[in-house]
Amino acid sequence: MKKRVNTYLAIAITTYCNYQCFYCKKGGESISKEKETISFDDVKKIIANAYANGIANFRITGGEPTSVSYFCELIEYIMKFKDTKVRINTNGFRILEYIDVLTKYKEYIDIVFSVDNLSEYICGVHFPKYLSQNVIEITRALRKNKISVRYNIVVTKLNECEVRELVQKAIDELDVNVKLLDLNRFSEYLGYSNEVTGKEAYDLWQELFVPMSNFYDFLCQISTHSQAEWTTSLI
């Protein structure tokens, strides 16, 4: 197998999620809007075919992938292939149930944890993925077992006021990496209380969008890397 450099395959194994974040869309990262989970046999075929074509890096996402019954078996299956690596995108739901298999393959696995802010509510808007005590304990358990953890923070005008403090707490107190993400522009969002589509979705995006350039000075202050190393050319 000729390995493809810097190429990975993202697989949304389920559209089910235990959270309903206002900035997300139906199905999460899946292109499907139906409530469904890909069968384990189908996922194995996808992985085997991808590996045969030079892909050895896999990102497992959803929905919430840790809610899928075959999650543990999936990790074991991917690790059977030589030189594979796995990134798991999760909100932390049930992740500690799999601590043994994650620790077993910790050299080849990293966890991307969605954590958006310090407070559960900002301006009356619910943020399910906040830095709760439970999230802190899960993070510490993963790091205690030497498992790589990164927080993904989706920045909006609502939580922008807490992002800097969250970043510093994550790095200094919890020993995790952090990635700031701007708000994806979708044609639909789950919304604050009801789903919004079309022009309403665009209006919501405009209302909430924050350019990453707002954080460049802050990142320069706390990072030992140059701007070219921690950002793209897109502002």
Task: Give the ranges of each region predicted by the language model.
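Conserved N-terminal glycine/acidic-rich loop preference
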Residues: 1-5, 22-23, 86-89, 142-147
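Canonical Radical SAM [4Fe-4S] cluster-binding loop centered on the CxxxCxxC motif
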Residues: 2-41
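Hydrophobic faces of well-ordered beta-strands that scaffold small-molecule active sites
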Residues: 7-11, 58-60, 86-88, 111-113, ...
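Canonical radical SAM enzyme core domain
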Residues: 31-45, 65-107, 114-122, 127-134, ...
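Short Fe-S-cluster ligation motifs
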Residues: 45-62
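Hydrophobic positions in alpha-helices of CheY-like receiver
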Residues: 50, 74, 78, 102, ...
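Radical SAM enzyme [4Fe-4S]-AdoMet core and its adjacent flexible, acidic
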Residues: 114-116, 120-235
